[in-house]
Amino acid sequence: MDCYTANWNPLGDSAFYRKYELYSMDWDLKEELRDCLVAAAPYGGPIALLRNPWRKEKAASVRPVLDIYSASGMPLASLLWKSGPVVSLGWSAEEELLCVQEDGAVLVYGLHGDFRRHFSMGNEVLQNRVLDARIFHTEFGSGVAILTGAHRFTLSANVGDLKLRRMPEVPGLQSAPSCWTVLCQDRVAHILLAVGPDLYLLDHAACSAVTPPGLAPGVSSFLQMAVSFTYRHLALFTDTGYIWMGTASLKEKLCEFNCNIRAPPKQMVWCSRPRSKERAVVVAWERRLMVVGDAPESIQFVLDEDSYLVPELDGVRIFSRSTHEFLHEVPAASEEIFKIASMAPGALLLEAQKEYEKESQKADEYLREIQELGQLTQAVQQCIEAAGHEHQPDMQKSLLRAASFGKCFLDRFPPDSFVHMCQDLRVLNAVRDYHIGIPLTYSQYKQLTIQVLLDRLVLRRLYPLAIQICEYLRLPEVQGVSRILAHWACYKVQQKDVSDEDVARAINQKLGDTPGVSYSDIAARAYGCGRTELAIKLLEYEPRSGEQVPLLLKMKRSKLALSKAIESGDTDLVFTVLLHLKNELNRGDFFMTLRNQPMALSLYRQFCKHQELETLKDLYNQDDNHQELGSFHIRASYAAEERIEGRVAALQTAADAFYKAKNEFAAKATEDQMRLLRLQRRLEDELGGQFLDLSLHDTVTTLILGGHNKRAEQLARDFRIPDKRLWWLKLTALADLEDWEELEKFSKSKKSPIGYLPFVEICMKQHNKYEAKKYASRVGPEQKVKALLLVGDVAQAADVAIEHRNEAELSLVLSHCTGATDGATADKIQRARAQAQKK
């Protein structure tokens, strides 16, 4: 363990800092880092280098090359820069490279050098040019702050939702500030800048002068400033060689350190660990690296090469042409276990496990000592926590073996923390591999979350590793494997050197019916890449027609979209396509398309019946559908025409259509309707009252009710109403009028073609038994019993039934007998039945 702590450096009495190598860089740089614009993304992100050809000592004719590497120096992309001079580079939270040009344009590139988009920082920036720029990160996203040639600041807090803010002017500012940075306080971005010995804070409304509390006297200029990773702390480097450290609000001083170097540093960044009370700043010059904090002494390292600092959540990454290192505060658990002469529970447990492997009795002694103090649970937890903060797998295994050894002597130690740590370390070791090049620490991994890490693997097109991690962690398919396969498929469709057929087959073989994968999304990506035929092939695998059809319409494959909509059976989907086709095609082509799709034609007719009647008529005309055309004119005659002449004309057109359709019945019926309308109009003129639009039967009934019997009979003859129907109409009308005398005359006018039982029924319906009895005697023998029962003459009905010897009539009469009044009648029927059975 003494050897293990050889690279530990104390800062004061309470903290140690260590620097270890992440990778040996093999990126074959042709330029020194000082001659390049450099940007490195946090959380073990990629590195972008752009050699600066716009420097005066360089040849202006040489075009710069933008190179993108992984953190291990593996090349990811290289492209010749063909745009304007670049002032600053920076990475967004989504690992998109933002290139801020001198003219205020910001070009956005993907991790593999693919151009994504561009935006401008405004006309004022374009006119005054860009002197300096900062890319910063907030809870809203990634922002850009610009210092223009007019010494004004413009910023946007979120490049994904660009809203430019012009900051207030600094009074009397005639030259560029000596240093400046972006602060994020209360969810608002501010600019802090130094002008000589003065500091100014710019917000959206005002410019205010601020003074750091407890600043050493004699400061005439601020040379460098740095804000911490979480924007909570601020460090200021003065021309006196003092480094002031305090809160970002400039209300509280943490400490001040005299580094005895007045030369401005190349970089200054914070180096702090989450939940740690220690605060330290790392300052870099050409060949010196210094770690300073709240201690009288500093930690100093010699830099053999030109280096670049990348602030992280829990430390600082330092890379040069040959190495990539990580500097951080030693975590508390590691310090407790590994510091010299430590008697911490975790240290004793680690020793006990090592002695156990040697089969030494000292293992039992160490273990008993921990158990006697009651600290075995604490020892296991310390070893588990320390394993997470170790970079070397061998040391991770040693600590986890110690934790596992200690767990064996605990009855109820929850295994979750141990299992999760093993899983997390396996994932971390996989992504830290040189060929992957994402040197995440455990703290960064937990802050980033597994979902974001998977997204970054997908962004690097490391699909197999991402899928293996999902399967190992047993993530739900929708969040894990399915999502990654969908990304893989979207990348696959961009490979234009492979045929559409092969790409579609490969995607289907890999994806199959994987839940959570949308073939329509993949097809949309293929269409966006200009591969329409591939998109159509992919849509064949999409089971949801509601996802197929919109994209087919977007691709101008409307007829195919119509076929798919019809196959789905979703009428709303069919209507959507039909309305799209109607706007896209001319009228003739639209109708021809409908003729080839009967279901679509039927649905469109239904639509037209409610919305576009004239279009419906055109459809019938084009199809020579005279039958439906006739029906259309009949409906139109009643719906649209109010004048009798117009209605008759529409009916005449309908009759002609029916004759063309060889439907003589409909044609004759239409002509009869025309005659009836003319007659009704004449009756209204001659008799008054309301006749128009009545049916033939209602017209006859109305005439009878009005006492115009002769006209009713003439109407019946003209329209050949059968006698039975006419008698029913007249019988009903006279009964409604309660004109019993006229009804009796009518019944005696000639023999009734409907018999006399209807007379009985109608009279009883009007509650007139007296009149009903008049007609009951005239009812024929076969209906006599029913008529007598209707008028309530049960006894006579029984006599008739006995006389007819009809079992059904006897049963009918018997059902009308009541015990109190018709007992004798019931006995009479029973005796008649008995006699009939004897015979």
Curated annotation (Swiss-Prot):
Which keywords does this Swiss-Prot/TrEMBL entry list? Answer: Autophagy, Cytoplasmic vesicle, Disease variant, Dystonia, Endosome, Lysosome, Membrane, Nitration, Protein transport, Transport
Give a single Pfam family match: Vps16_N
Q: Which GO terms describe its molecular function?
A: actin binding; actin filament binding
Q: How does it sit in the membrane?
A: Peripheral membrane protein
Recorded hits in Gene3D superfamilies, A to Z, give:
Vps16, C-terminal region (1.10.150.780)
User: Which BP terms does GO give this entry?
Assistant: autophagosome maturation; endosomal transport; endosomal vesicle fusion; endosome to lysosome transport; intracellular protein transport; regulation of SNARE complex assembly; vacuole fusion, non-autophagic
Give the UniProt tissue specificity note.
Ubiquitous.
Recorded hits in InterPro entries, A to Z, give: VPS16, Vps16_C, Vps16_C_sf, Vps16_N
Its annotated compartments are: Late endosome membrane; Lysosome membrane; Early endosome; Cytoplasmic vesicle, Clathrin-coated vesicle
Report the domain of life of the source organism: Eukaryota
Residues modified as 3'-nitrotyrosine are Y4
- Name one cellular component (GO) term: autophagosome
Q: Where is this region: Interaction with VPS33A?
A: 642-736
Q: What disease is associated with this protein? A: Dystonia 30: A form of dystonia, a disorder defined by the presence of sustained involuntary muscle contraction, often leading to abnormal postures. DYT30 is characterized by early onset and predominantly cervical, bulbar, orofacial, and upper limb involvement. Some patients have a more complex phenotype with neurocognitive impairment, including mild intellectual disability or psychiatric manifestations. Loss of ambulation is observed in some cases. DYT30 inheritance is autosomal dominant with incomplete penetrance.
> Which family, according to the similarity comment?
Belongs to the VPS16 family.
* Protein function: Plays a role in vesicle-mediated protein trafficking to lysosomal compartments including the endocytic membrane transport and autophagic pathways. Believed to act as a core component of the putative HOPS and CORVET endosomal tethering complexes which are proposed to be involved in the Rab5-to-Rab7 endosome conversion probably implicating MON1A/B, and via binding SNAREs and SNARE complexes to mediate tethering and docking events during SNARE-mediated membrane fusion.
Q: How does it assemble?
A: Core component of at least two putative endosomal tethering complexes, the homotypic fusion and vacuole protein sorting (HOPS) complex and the class C core vacuole/endosome tethering (CORVET) complex. Their common core is composed of the class C Vps proteins VPS11, VPS16, VPS18 and VPS33A, which in HOPS further associates with VPS39 and VPS41 and in CORVET with VPS8 and TGFBRAP1. Interacts with RAB5C. Interacts with STX17, MON1B. Associates with adapter protein complex 3 (AP-3) and clathrin:AP-3 complexes.
This chain belongs to the protein called Vacuolar protein sorting-associated protein 16 homolog
Organism of origin:
Homo sapiens
Q: Which gene encodes it?
A: VPS16
